[in-house]
């Protein structure tokens, strides 16, 4: 917290359950259950208690942050806070280490424009319609988050949700299509596992 949150001005960020509870101002997690006997039907959203296990391993879903905090983090990882995250550190973090063929398949179900998935140190690298893209995403019970940026354009997006809706992951290709001037597809309207016609 002293090495990153404070110097980056991430005033609401913390890495423990106690700090989250003490803040009093945070979005409660929401879930919904699949209806019995239905493959595509779900019940209503309902609020649930937070799951304490996520804070036992801070690197695995144990950070609490507001959208303002995440905006500061996005500035840092895009090279605008070299006093905290020097360029050589970012280069090390973002250098691809392994190819991710399973990630290619998963992301193709979100948008076929995601290709060439690789894994760096905690970050995924893709080519989105040929444009370099760096991203990190994850979910825990009742929450989902995604941060992504186009390093050659110095533009990024942060998506935070107090649910694990699969539509959350479809916001990113919608944003990327707008930013890159690509033909628009209604990714949010697509069912899971389908791709829009003509978007190969």
Task: Kindly give the residue locations of the regions a language model identified.
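Short, surface-exposed loop or secondary-structure junction motifs
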Residues: 1-141
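Short, low-complexity, polar/charged sequence segments that are solvent-exposed and flexible
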Residues: 33-36, 112, 141-144, 153-155, ...
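Residue-level recognition of conserved structural "scaffold" positions that shape functional pockets
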Residues: 68-69, 129, 145, 149, ...
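Short coil/turn residues that cap or connect secondary-structure elements
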Residues: 81, 142, 163-167
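Short, gly/Ser/Thr-rich active-site loops of penicillin-recognizing serine hydrolases
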Residues: 98-108, 131, 159-200
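Generic structural motif
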Residues: 126-128, 152, 164
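Short, well-ordered beta-strand elements
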Residues: 135-136, 146-162
